[in-house]
Amino acid sequence: MLRKLKVLLFIPLLFVATACCDRGAEMAKYTIHFDLRKAVKMNLPEFVDSIFVIPLATNDSSLIKNVVGLSFVDSIFYINDNQTNILSFDSKGNFLCSTGKLRGSGPNEYFACIAFNILENGNCEIFDGLKHRLWEYDSNLNYVSSSELPEDVLPASNFLRVSKDICIIEDVNSLKFYSSKEGRVLKMISLPQKKGLPSITRNSGLKKLNDEIYYSLRTPERILFKVDIEKMSLQPYYAFDFGQHNLNLRELPNELPLSFYQNYVMANDGVAFVADKLVSSTMQMLSLIHISEPT
């Protein structure tokens, strides 16, 4: 019979510290153990109170081509559409405004929105990788300020402001700690990616919760890291242990054809591939892909 593909969502409630099979997992503060043989089906009402759909207003100004980023701040949804403009909607889906009219080649106009932040004062900060600038606009889309970015901040796929001075800039191979005051990268951390292995999730690996910053690799790494802003370092925080189903990226061979890495997830029975990791103040959620043995 055909193999059965399982996409599982877990809400772990118990954390037990123990040793695991790779260095990152051994250093993690918490280890969460899963026995995939005992996986049980859960009904959605068991862990959520309600689910509802918010239809977004549709007009010529609010059409969305491709959602590449989403933030929900002070009851307003902000959507990064195809890295070109930011659209905002209220909690009922009513269209508020778009930064599209600010996009261009003029002196106070941005050209590309790789990522954005909504600042504490409600202003929008746009990371423009093509013009090499950080732009700030107020809630009425008026130009506030801009600053030039040095060449070494690129390439970049996302950025997150963690203080008035420090931004974390993410790309495929590194995290860069950038000082707005000094206008330079203070430190760069190389990420333990396996070259060629495809990203399972498109979501940004940077998550901010209660002034803490977490980072998750986009490839199927089973470690969730915590970012130490003062030391500008990554610390293994949660390790997810699937026993015999563990995947250790560091054990994969190097310099094989790209097709090997692209097909690795679907070609390996019995291995649990972590797809995404989320942390909140009340729960920790993990989604994974596991291909069961043939039956």
Named regions from a protein language model:
Residues L286-T295:
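Residue-level detector of conserved catalytic or cofactor/ligand-binding positions
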Residues T18-A19:
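C-terminal motif of bacterial Sec signal peptides marking the signal peptidase cleavage site
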Residues D60, G100-P107, L149-A156, L191-G196, ...:
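Short coil/turn segments at the loop-to-beta-strand junctions that recur within blades
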Residues T58-S61, F95-E120:
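Blade-loop segments of beta-propeller domains
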Residues N66-G69, Y110-A115, V153-R161, P198-G205:
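Repeated scaffold domains used in trafficking and secretory/extracellular systems
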Residues F72-D74, I118-N121, R161-K164, L209-N210:
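Residue-level detector of Asp-centered blade-edge/turn motifs that repeat once per structural unit
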Residues K38-L63:
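A short helix->beta-strand "capping" segment at the edge of beta-propeller domains
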Residues G129-D171, I189-K195:
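Asp-box/WD-like beta-propeller blade repeats and closely related beta-sheet repeat scaffolds
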